[in-house]
């Protein structure tokens, strides 16, 4: 007798209770802090009347210090347990919700930075928890795409919230303070995941290598590209300011935030499981669709702003940037989970987050300074460096393919 064949749609096997808990935590976290990130440049520049370079400095401090917290978070999580560290860091993020309660820009930037550093501390551990929840390498890109979709989907809803709040002239202090609620729900949701506990180090395997063995050929290329992309990974506040200033409408800036977040979320959700399971294929798509796509998007914004082509062209450029971001946020951690597996996953994720943060420290500072000279020059710089990141990743594909074949 032949076994019966199940019919009808089936739930993806990797979409377990732990994956849902981690992904919903990401949704609520972005729903909270992305509302602050969307409104903070408007609060600092338009309400407190501070120059744009101060916003660039604030972003640089957040990401620069965040690099240290990311790197330390990966290592500490490997020693003490990723679940405990992720919960502790997540619980401190609401500091940034308090930044509009003060009129002093130094205190406002300090509160924003403190909450962001807590986010950086927990981010590598949250990624490791997802890796442990999805043991099959071939399912990782789909899982990280799902995480990114809910993550950025929360950010898109945050944009809707800020847009509606500004439309009814709600003060920034109340807009930001209300974000404490979803941030607390984020920590509650993360606590329902039961992976990421403290464990003894795994025995070295072919993918993680022995302590003295050189890392896989793609690992250094991935970290270098992540850092270079970080040099162009300006805070989302810059597109918000660009569209608001280019169109002369404050609400259009928040609309740009919504376009970027929604495009990025849909990309992760729809394409996450279709981007390949092997590291060589993932690297090729990361370089072409991710980094080079980001270069194209920044170029469109630079050209559209410089030639005064109107709101539609600016939003097209922002949408391309969002698409590229969805590819990058899905494939970077998925590739690293293969290159650095087992007990080295935390260090690999920490190094990846740190590389991005170091680059972003420079990127936001450069964008803030160049933005004051020429908006088109700032985005032209971003396009050039993102293109270089894409080339570095694509050059590593042949050697990575050989490494994966010989494993």
Can you say where each PLM-predicted feature lies in the sequence?
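Cytoplasmic helix-loop-helix junction between adjacent transmembrane helices
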Residues: 111-151
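Symmetry-related core transmembrane helices of the 12-TM Major Facilitator Superfamily/SLC fold
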Residues: 173-191, 379-396
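Conserved MFS/SLC helix-loop-helix module at the cytosolic interface between two early adjacent transmembrane helices
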Residues: 67-104
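Helix-to-loop junctions at the C-terminal end of transmembrane segments
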Residues: 69-81, 266-281, 371
């Amino acid at each position: 007798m032949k076994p019966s064949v199940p019919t009808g749609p089936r739930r993806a096997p990797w979409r377990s209770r732990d994956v849902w808990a981690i992904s919903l935590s990401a949704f609520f976290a972005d729903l909270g802090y992305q509302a602050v990130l969307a409104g903070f440049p408007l609060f600092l520049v338009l309400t407190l009347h501070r120059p744009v370079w101060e916003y660039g400095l604030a972003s640089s401090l957040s990401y620069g210090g965040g690099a240290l917290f990311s790197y330390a978070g990966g290592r500490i999580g490997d020693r003490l347990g990723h679940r405990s560290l992720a919960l502790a860091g997540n619980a401190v993020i609401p500091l940034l919700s308090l930044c509009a309660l003060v009129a002093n820009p130094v205190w406002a930037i300090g509160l924003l930075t403190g909450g962001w550093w807590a986010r950086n501390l927990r981010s590598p551990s949250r990624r490791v928890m997802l890796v442990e929840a999805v043991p099959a390498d071939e399912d990782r890109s789909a899982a990280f795409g799902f995480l990114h979709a809910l993550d950025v989907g929360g950010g898109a809803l945050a944009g809707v919230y800020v847009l509606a709040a500004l439309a009814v002239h709600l003060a920034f202090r109340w807009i930001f303070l209300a974000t404490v609620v979803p941030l607390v729900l984020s920590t509650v949701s993360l606590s329902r995941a039961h992976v990421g506990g403290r464990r003894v180090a795994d025995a070295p395997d072919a993918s993680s290598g022995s302590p003295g063995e050189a890392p896989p050929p793609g690992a250094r290329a991935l970290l270098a590209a992540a850092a270079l992309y970080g040099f162009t990974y300006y805070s989302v506040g810059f597109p918000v300011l660009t569209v608001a200033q280019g169109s002369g409408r404050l609400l259009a800036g928040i609309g740009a935030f919504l376009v970027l977040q929604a495009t990025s979320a849909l990309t992760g959700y729809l394409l996450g499981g279709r981007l390949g399971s092997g590291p060589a294929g993932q690297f090729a798509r990361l370089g072409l669709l991710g980094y080079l796509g980001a270069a194209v998007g920044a170029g469109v914004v630079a050209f559209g702003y410089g030639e005064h082509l109107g709101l539609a062209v600016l939003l097209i450029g922002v949408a391309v940037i969002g698409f590229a971001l969805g590819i990058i946020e899905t494939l970077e951690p998925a590739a690293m989970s293969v290159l650095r597996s087992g007990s080295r996953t935390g260090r690999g994720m920490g190094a990846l987050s740190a590389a991005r943060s170091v680059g972003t420290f420079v990127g936001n500072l450069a964008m803030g300074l160049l933005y004051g000279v020429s908006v088109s020059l700032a985005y032209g710089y971003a396009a050039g460096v993102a293109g270089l990141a894409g080339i570095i990743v694509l050059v590593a594909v042949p050697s990575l393919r050989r490494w994966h074949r010989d494993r």
